[in-house]
Amino acid sequence: MTEIERKFLVATFPDGELHAVPLRQGYLTTPTDSIELRLRQQGTEYFMTLKSEGGLSRQEYEIQIDVTQFEMLWPATEGRRVEKTRYSGKLPDGQLFELDVFAGHLSPLMLVEVEFLSEDAAQAFIPPPWFGEEVTEDKRYKNKALALSIP
């Protein structure tokens, strides 16, 4: 499946109704690998995700795993982890966004992502005033880099 998204720093936390869920992610690959293999605990659900390289558009495959599989693989992510709270909401035009507030050594970093059905829609998107600088193409803001305390 192709994932098309743009990522921004957050200038100010948005007003409105948001749904929050705690996340922890660990990476089985390093930032220099051409693919990304990630484990994620999202509330009480567990996932393994494979992503290709890319900025605006890249391939993504995700499967749900059980807690036993997650806990068996989690130790292999030591030193390559992030913890955050993900807030989901809608922009005034109905477009969904996901805002991540990072914990621990990455606090007070906040990033917001918006996914699109096409690259044309992504290019036409005008971010609202509470969005900050765009970092879609900046590899330092990929979660696998953040897991190593970069930037």
Swiss-Prot record:
The keyword Cell membrane does not apply. Residues 1-148 form the CYTH domain. GO terms for molecular function: inorganic triphosphate phosphatase activity. It catalyses: triphosphate + H2O = phosphate + diphosphate. Optimum pH is around 9.7. It is an enzyme of class 3 (hydrolase). SMART domains: CYTH. Optimum temperature is between 50 and 55 degrees Celsius. Its EC number is 3.6.1.25. Homodimer. This is Inorganic triphosphatase.
